[in-house]
């Protein structure tokens, strides 16, 4: 009885302390957001780089903050900050896409991008999660990346390091982004044959979505929760039964950098949620692995058909995925060195 009382007392003492930590965190991020909002331009510069580096370093450590439960003022700040981050990311990727395009073979110099290693880690994590949660499926042969941008590193890394026989269809609403992205693969005979770039609003893409085994939804496609929900519902209507959906989200204080996606929205969109993984290292985005339920097989005589429901269990973050990802990386780096150097 005494132990229980002491535990309750300690919990009450820790709660105000935790609230104070969150309050200070939000206060610091608010100050950084104000400073970023005053910048005359979000194009790469020492001042821009310094502010965003400080912001990222502030948001990366594990935090118990639930950004969805913040007050109205903090929510408004968060919404503005995510839009600023999206604009800055677009400027950064366009800048480095131009830098890389100046080389005879741009893919030999991808490590010039300051966050290239993050993309390597994210791609290996997503690949390992797909392999773990869809183990019976054959390797995907056609993939789509929605919101690929001017520097489609996710597609490039997955194509060269993990799926060397697959084709990748990259969708972006901006024609200039696709023009920049396509320049990067022209000198590589293999990747140029496996990479396609489509200028389109994904909300208008319908029948083509049924051709893909896996669809990746970039974190910044549909920044508002309602917009993201409509996008997922659209994908649920038009993707092929049995196809996988990989959604990038955010968790904790990282939700100040990217939109947070509720797994329930994925379910409501017509998918089984197979896993939700929240990395704790340099990789900022959380990853949600989902699948559109396959068409039920015809009932056997004297028995019932087995069909997927919508109550899939969401796996908690685990170290096994990270271990698998590291193992995949070690095995594949040797064969990928010639295809996609990282230095």
Swiss-Prot record:
The keyword S-adenosyl-L-methionine applies. GO terms for biological process: nicotianamine biosynthetic process. PROSITE patterns: NAS (PS51142). Expressed in leaves. InterPro entries: Nicotian_synth, SAM-dependent_MTases_sf. Induction: By iron deficiency in roots. Down-regulated in chlorotic leaves by iron deficiency. It comes from the Eukaryota. It is an enzyme of class 2 (transferase). GO terms for molecular function: nicotianamine synthase activity. It catalyses: 3 S-adenosyl-L-methionine = nicotianamine + 3 S-methyl-5'-thioadenosine + 3 H(+). Coiled coil: none annotated. Keywords: S-adenosyl-L-methionine, Transferase. Its EC number is 2.5.1.43. The keyword S-adenosyl-L-methionine applies. Synthesizes nicotianamine, a polyamine that is the first intermediate in the synthesis of the phytosiderophores of the mugineic acid type found in gramineae which serve as a sensor for the physiological iron status within the plant, and/or might be involved in the transport of iron. Belongs to the nicotianamine synthase (NAS)-like family. This is Nicotianamine synthase 3. The lineage of its organism: Eukaryota, Viridiplantae, Streptophyta, Embryophyta, Tracheophyta. The gene is NAS3.
């Amino acid at each position: 009885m005494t132990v229980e009382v002491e535990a309750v007392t300690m919990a009450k003492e820790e709660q105000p302390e935790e609230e104070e930590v969150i309050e200070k965190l939000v206060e610091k991020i608010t100050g950084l957001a104000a400073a970023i909002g005053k910048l005359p331009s979000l194009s790469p510069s020492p001042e821009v780089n310094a502010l965003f580096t400080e912001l990222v370093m502030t948001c990366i450590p594990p935090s118990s903050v639930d950004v969805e439960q913040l007050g109205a003022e903090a929510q408004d700040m968060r919404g503005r900050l995510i839009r600023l981050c999206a604009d800055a990311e677009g400027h950064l990727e366009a800048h480095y896409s131009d830098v890389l395009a100046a080389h005879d073979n741009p893919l030999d110099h991808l490590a010039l991008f300051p966050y290239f290693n993050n993309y390597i880690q994210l791609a290996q994590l997503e690949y390992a999660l797909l392999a773990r949660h869809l183990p019976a499926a054959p390797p995907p042969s056609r993939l789509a990346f929605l919101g690929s941008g001017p520097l489609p590193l996710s597609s490039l890394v997955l194509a060269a390091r993990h799926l060397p026989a697959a084709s990748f269809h990259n969708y972006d609403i901006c024609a200039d982004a696709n023009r920049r992205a396509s320049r990067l693969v022209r000198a590589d005979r293999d990747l140029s044959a496996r990479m396609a770039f489509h200028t389109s609003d994904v909300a208008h893409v319908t029948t083509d979505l049924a051709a893909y085994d896996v669809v990746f939804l970039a974190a910044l496609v549909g920044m508002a929760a309602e917009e993201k929900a409509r996008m997922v519902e659209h994908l649920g209507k038009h993707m092929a039964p049995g196809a996988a959906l990989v959604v990038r989200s955010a968790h904790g204080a990282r939700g100040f950098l990217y939109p947070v996606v509720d797994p329930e929205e994925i379910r409501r969109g017509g998918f089984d949620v197979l896993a939700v993984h929240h990395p704790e290292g340099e990789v900022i985005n959380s990853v949600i692995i989902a699948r559109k339920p396959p068409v039920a097989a015809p009932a056997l005589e004297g028995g019932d058909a087995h069909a997927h429901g919508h109550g899939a269990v969401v796996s908690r973050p685990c170290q096994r995925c990270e271990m698998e990802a590291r193992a995949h990386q070690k095995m594949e780096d040797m064969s990928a060195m010639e295809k996609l150097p990282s230095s």
